[in-house]
């Protein structure tokens, strides 16, 4: 699927409008829908990194030679942590974009991993992509909920060092937003306030008939398919395959990433779209990738650390 988004960008001493969302100089969103018609720029989520809103407005990106110098001279873990600390100290608008690797350190399995796929097929007879599709939910809700409750509805998981470090960074006034692909709500449990959940949350559930709200415990404790007292089936507020992302959540994520002077991407291989394409909206020169394995964007990053996201962030955030 290919997503196109229209952004409007303008700057003044008092406010900035990105994606039709007005910001003050302190990064507070002051108005949704104030688009500046004088500076339209059409950008696609899967465009090359060089196509960014700020580049279109004449702001210069860091050169390849400078990027390589930062990466190549920081060879060991301690040096890279020092470099990450310096980046954080010089930044005012940090955004974190996270994936499944953040949650796996809390004991939550990654259903897209080789082990996760094997478990799904072995236990339920279908791959995760089919089990978690809208079509499967409608046609075989009994199997869907058996899989969902067994492997995704993890209400007993606790925040880890990465969640704690990000909440601390937000409390310090450095971090403006967490953009996550995870549905477990652990960022909020750790204390983060401004969280954009791209794929929804297990903690929000609604009756498909009357729209009544139910928490995760109700769904978990309900035997078989969860039903509302009105008789309607309850659907978790998680984005299934074949479903679109919430446009308001996507807009907020894009706006914050576009305004960021530092983007930390952690616990993701950057291969799941459209979430991975959000990195293309960043136009600064402090792109940090923290993942145990390499990603397609490593050559674009100013700093790459192949290690545990919790270990790295807890060492860097003081």
What is each stretch, according to the model?
Residues 3-6, 11-13, 19-23, 37-38, ...:
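N-terminal amphipathic/hydrophobic targeting modules at extreme N-termini
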Residues 24-29:
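Intrinsically disordered, low-complexity proline-rich regions
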Residues 30, 34-38, 60-62:
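Ser/Thr-rich, low-complexity intrinsically disordered segments
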Residues 42-44, 54, 58-318:
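Conserved catalytic core of sirtuin-type NAD+-dependent deacylases
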């Amino acid at each position: 699927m290919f997503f196109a988004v229209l952004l409007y960008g303008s700057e003044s001493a008092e406010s900035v409008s990105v994606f039709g969302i007005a910001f003050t100089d302190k990064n507070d969103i002051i108005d949704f829908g104030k688009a500046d018609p004088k500076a339209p720029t059409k950008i696609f989520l899967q465009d090359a990194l060089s196509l960014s809103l700020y580049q279109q407005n004449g702001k210069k990106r860091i050169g390849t030679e400078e990027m390589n110098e930062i990466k190549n001279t920081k060879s060991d873990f301690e040096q890279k942590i020092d470099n990450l600390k310096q980046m954080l100290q010089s930044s005012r608008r940090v955004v974190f974009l996270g994936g499944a690797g953040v949650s796996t350190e809390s004991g939550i399995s990654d259903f897209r991993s080789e082990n996760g796929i094997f478990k799904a097929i072995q236990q339920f007879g279908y791959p995760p992509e089919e089990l978690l599709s809208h079509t499967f939910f409608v046609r075989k809700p009994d199997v869907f909920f058996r899989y969902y409750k067994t492997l995704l509805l993890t209400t007993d998981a606790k925040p880890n060092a990465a969640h704690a470090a990000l909440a601390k960074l937000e409390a310090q006034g450095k971090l403006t937003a967490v953009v996550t692909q995870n549905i477990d709500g652990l960022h909020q449990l750790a204390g983060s306030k401004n969280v954009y959940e791209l794929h929804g949350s297990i903690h929000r559930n609604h009756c498909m008939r009357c729209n009544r709200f139910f928490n995760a415990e109700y769904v978990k404790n309900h035997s078989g398919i969860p039903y509302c007292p009105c008789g309607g089936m309850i659907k978790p507020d998680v984005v299934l395959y074949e479903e679109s992302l919430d446009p308001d959540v996507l807009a907020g994520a894009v706006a914050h990433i576009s305004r960021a002077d530092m983007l930390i991407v952690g616990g993701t291989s950057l291969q799941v779209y459209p979430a991975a394409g959000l990195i293309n909206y960043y136009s600064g020169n402090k792109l940090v990738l923290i993942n145990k394995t390499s990603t397609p964007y490593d050559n674009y990053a100013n700093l790459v650390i192949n290690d545990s996201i919790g270990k790295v962030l807890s060492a860097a955030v003081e």
